[in-house]
Amino acid sequence: MPLVVRFPDVLKNRLETLQSAFDMAINSQGYEAHYQGVYPVKCNQDRFVVEDIVKFGSPYRFGLEAGSKPELLLAMNCLSKGSADALLVCNGFKDTEYISLALVARKLLLNSVIVLEQEEELDLVIDISRKMSVRPVIGLRAKLRTKHSGHFGSTSGEKGKFGLTTTQILRVVKKLDESGMLDCLQLLHFHIGSQIPTTELLADGVGEATQIYSELVRLGAGMKFIDIGGGLGIDYDGSKSSNSDVSVCYSIEEYASAVVQAVLYVCDRKGGKHPVICSESGRAIVSHHSILIFEAVSASTSHVSTQPSSGGLQSLVETLNEDARADYRNLSAAAVRGEYDTCLIYSDQLKQRCVEQFKDGSLDIEQLAAVDSICDWVSKAIGVADPVRTYHVNLSVFTSIPDFWGFSQLFPIVPIHRLDEKPTMRGILSDLTCDSDGKVDKFIGGESSLPLHEIGSGDGGRYYLGMFLGGAYEEALGGLHNLFGGPSVVRVMQSDSPHSFA
């Protein structure tokens, strides 16, 4: 433990669902081109995951997207076993080696497209392609004005990290024309941001991009593809809300329909040929296919304070200073009157004054503990004691759930056994690392604790929990914090018979 359980059949289903949604939208709206997606390797670069996507996507011309030289090498190797028409979209910062590799891919009959993220990359592409005697296929990333305001929207808009402005796009077109390579410009790429919250925002961005696409056609580019990037969101918390970074208010079918409709509207109005629609929907494809299983090895116990005896209580009160004795008298009076909020105020004041006495040496540790017991007993007596326990779980949050630590990304976490028993406790999760940030204390639905079972009352004292929808990015981002090592991995696939698994 911890253990990552992967279900390639779920991966296949997600890919087929995405393809089916676009096929349905294309057929129902009379769109005159097709959809073919690409999987961004950065979402989960595990070899088996990438190979499964290429295998399952081969009938649909499904390709890969790379953002670095190592990712490009992995993608080239995997796509050599895929569809000949699959796209190999080459994004990211590009130096001489990167561009040379992308051109080698074309020599190997892979359908690589070099997407310009910076204007300076064009000179390298022209120069290297001539030296290698390879006719490149070029795309460019447009920096749209459309953006969304959530956490994931920072890469979009005019001040986004990537892409070319309209002025830069025109300069690229002019230079390609002067070089006799304008026909090589075949793809327009853009990215509004991950977790696009609404189809209205999506349609706005796709419409703007299609206008740019149509202008490139008018200027003589050999345009064929419009790559709408990522952004197909996951409803992590089940709220179907447009006001949350962990939810979206649309289905895959509604997403596909909005994209096709937006492209169709602009192209028909301009009288242009419909482009092949491409998307880079990594999160939507791989999030569901794996489960992180981990064990709660222990839990903090709830200490039940007993009511002190009257004699012991009187002896303790006599050792307190005058201010602390006043707090105790006020606490007692408020409890008799049933003023529970006032009780808490005087209880906190009493504890703080006694801490000060302990610091100056006038109160010993036994007396300080007795005061704590009095205050705890009062809290329990009036029903405001904190019932939340800390469950110590055998993992590192930094390694296995880095997005929670980094920006409080929420994931569904539930017990995965003893489901016929009603949970009787509430708890937060604390990992086994030596860092105070290694805990999970925010959960789906705005909860600050989870309903959990008592440890040790079944299954040999073992207690297992599962985290879901973590198939994208968590494994890719996790390191070896505290040298804990990575989780073990198990692949579960349905075999020939309906209820048999391997």
Curated annotation (Swiss-Prot):
Cofactor requirement: pyridoxal 5'-phosphate; Mg(2+)
Keyword Cell cycle in record: no
Record bears the keyword Nucleotide-binding: no
Pfam family, one: Orn_Arg_deC_N
N6-(pyridoxal phosphate)lysine modifications at: K42
Annotated GO biological process: arginine catabolic process; putrescine biosynthetic process; spermidine biosynthetic process
PANTHER family hit by this protein: ARGININE DECARBOXYLASE (PTHR43295:SF7)
Family the UniProt entry places it in: Belongs to the Orn/Lys/Arg decarboxylase class-II family. SpeA subfamily.
Protein name: Arginine decarboxylase
